[in-house]
Regions:
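Subset of outer-membrane beta-barrel
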Residues: 97, 101-106, 141-161, 165-170, ...
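Surface-exposed extracellular loop regions of Gram-negative outer-membrane beta-barrel proteins
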Residues: 99-118, 197-208, 290-294
Length: 420
């Protein structure tokens, strides 16, 4: 496989840059993971939604109010991988977004600021997009932190919200687990472009364009952008204890551009999925808060280019979870790709193409278990921890891997001036 193909499937730049050699899994490390996971105070489950999503509706109480918003996520994550699919590595660091925000009228909101990523022990950072974009500018560096400008404009209608600039990305898209690795919330650059968010009683739709790499005349790298659409159909009465939903999702990445002087040509690859899910919420929630299950079918397709050594493939995924005491989430599932499949932004254990050695396996089956626990101090202040275990089986090879992480989100809002 070419170096281009290998760099493409490396979803997370930081994982490659700060990768470390894997050490054998020991009882001490497993005990440390368990201690960090369960030594937290009671709270509620759905940790990543609390840690990495934001409300995109305009707060009408903030009309004609100038304020400072600070969003911060501090994290320590350790991926103890002894895998043919990917490398083991740790992510110790934080990102912070200080922003100046103003809402001139009820339908318009403006924000401007900076996004800075910092990894403990690093003092200079390569200047390229931190999310699966090749090493085009690896000789250019920033010192101290990886810093980007941050600008967002929102316009809100009755059922539609239009976002330009830095969009509500990452966890906000609510992509299914095999198509999106939640770890990406820690290390990716803020998504930027445009977004349409549509809300009706029986439908939530998120359609976006994330422009990842811009090129100038006769530039030496490719233009790159991702287009996505995530629909959640909500049939029936969603107030009932037992309710169901239909997720339909599409993610396309395109590389090329008429100004491109490279010889790589146009490259377009995609993932698509459709499925169905059930959620049951008992009336007495003292212990059992909710039970959910979901099944999805997925396809991967290479419309043009040669990033993948195959043109397409299919996979399926089933998963179930239970929330206890409104604070503890236990989840498990199984992913299977009978022949070929690559997840553009998912975990490497949900792909048949190895990022470690470039090998393409004829099929993969991954069973996994996930436990998470979080403490919500207030709406904008969340402490969480999680542990994940993966059992993957490929042709002639099987492996067990685990990871754990601890995260703290702090998101204060400070009013500077209010006009009547």
């Amino acid at each position: 496989m070419t170096r281009t193909a290998s760099s493409f499937i490396q979803k997370n730049m930081v994982a490659d840059t700060f990768s470390c050699s894997h050490q054998s899994v020991t009882v001490r490390r497993i005990c440390l993971a368990a201690l960090l996971l369960f030594a937290l105070l009671p709270a509620r489950a759905q940790m990543w939604d609390s840690l990495a999503t934001s409300d995109y509706h305009i707060d009408t109480a903030m009309v004609r109010v100038l304020r400072v918003e600070v969003d911060n996520l501090t994290f320590f994550r350790d991926n103890e991988y002894s895998s043919q699919m990917t490398k083991g590595y740790s992510l110790p660091g934080l990102w912070i977004e200080p922003r100046l925000a103003y809402t001139p009228i009820r339908q318009i909101d403006l924000e401007v600021g900076l996004h800075a990523s910092l990894f403990h022990g690093a003092n200079k950072y390569p200047n390229y997009v931190y999310h699966d974009i090749g090493r085009w500018k690896g000789s250019q560096y920033q010192r101290g932190a990886h810093v980007l400008p941050w600008v967002r404009a929102r316009a809100e209608f009755k059922h539609l919200t239009v976002v330009l600039g830095n969009i509500y990305g990452g966890q906000n898209h609510q992509l299914i687990e095999p198509l999106f690795n939640a770890e990406t919330n820690l290390s990716q650059d803020p998504e930027a472009g445009m977004q349409l968010l549509w809300d009706r009683k029986h439908l939530h739709a998120d359609t976006w364009l994330n422009w990842q790499s811009y090129i100038f005349e006769e530039d030496s790298h490719q233009e790159a952008f991702t287009v996505g659409s995530s629909w959640k159909v909500l049939p029936g009465n969603q107030e009932k204890p037992l309710r169901w939903h239909i997720p339909v999702q599409l993610v396309i990445q395109h590389r090329g551009g008429e100004q491109d002087t490279t010889s790589m040509g146009v490259q377009t690859i995609m993932n698509a999925s459709a499925g169905a899910g059930l959620t049951w919420t008992p009336r007495n929630r003292k212990v059992l808060t909710s039970v959910n299950a979901e099944a999805n079918a997925m396809v991967a397709y290479q419309q043009s280019g040669s990033i993948w050594p195959f043109d397409g493939g299919a996979a399926y995924h089933v998963g179930a979870g239970v929330t206890l005491w409104q604070r503890l989430l236990l989840r498990g599932g199984y992913f299977n790709a009978p022949k070929h499949f690559v997840s553009l932004y998912g975990n490497h254990f949900f792909s048949t193409l190895s990022v470690r050695n470039g090998q393409s396996y004829d099929g993969i089956g991954t069973a996994y278990a996930h436990v998470e626990y979080s403490h919500v101090f207030a709406r904008r202040y969340v402490l969480g921890a999680e542990g994940e275990f993966f059992q993957s089986n490929m042709t002639g090879h099987s492996e067990t891997n685990f990871s754990f992480g601890v995260y703290l989100r702090v998101n204060p809002s400070i009013i500077i001036k209010r006009w009547k």
